[in-house]
Amino acid sequence: MRIGIRAHDVAYAPLEELIPNIHAQGFHCMHIALSKSIKEFKPGVETMTPGLAMYIKELCTENKVDVAVLGCYLNLCNPNPEKHKEIVEKYKAHIRFASILGCGVVGTETGAVNEEYKYEPANHSEEALQCFIDNLRPIVKYAEQFGVIVAIEPVWKHIVYTVERARKVLDAIDSPNLQIIFDPVNLLCVDNLAQQDEIIEKAFELLLKDIAVVHCKDYI
């Protein structure tokens, strides 16, 4: 196991300073979402070039910091067809970018049924779950071609909000290139806090062999 840090949890700096700063804090790997860590330009399909990937890879090599996860936090169940097409292309760009970067995992969350990507009760419906499975399947298929793992992170406010639903997604898509980012705090809400131990135990029971990354944090 290697302990890393999310790049956007470190004080902002340009990449040529950010990555050395991460190493200086004692970390040897990071979870980076380009849209959260690059402010000099807008990361997108057009700017996520092989050259940029190689530049970041060289910075990482020089500073002995691996990219453990490339974050892509976009809503695969956006109901707007045009925006959904754009989102799919961005996922594909992240997968290609990760393969050049030498990053094995593209991490994501599981979306909402609205354009605003916010909680509403319909996120927890069976229809929402099926929408997510249907829209995730071609993304995972694309990742298989590049040898990249797509890791989904269950979050209570989103479509995959329990460990049981996460297991359903894994079983439905049935690919070694689909795994889990497990953040136990993100599965909690005011209504289930008293069951936190049981929820964590159930997560390891149902998901253990498919967990690629664990997020650790305190909460209030």
Question: What function would you assign to each model-found segment?
Answer:
Residues 11-23, 85-95, 193-205:
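Short, acidic/polar
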Residues 31-57, 110-117:
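Glycine-rich, proline-tolerant flexible connector loops at the mouths of alpha/beta enzymes
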Residues 1-3, 65-68, 88:
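Transmembrane beta-strand segments of Gram-negative outer membrane beta-barrel proteins
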Residues 16-17, 54-63, 77-182:
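Active-site acidic/histidine proton-transfer and metal-coordination neighborhood
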Residues 1-13:
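Boundary/entry segment of secreted carbohydrate-active catalytic domains
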Residues 2-5, 30, 36, 70, ...:
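Acidic/histidine-rich catalytic cores of soluble enzymes
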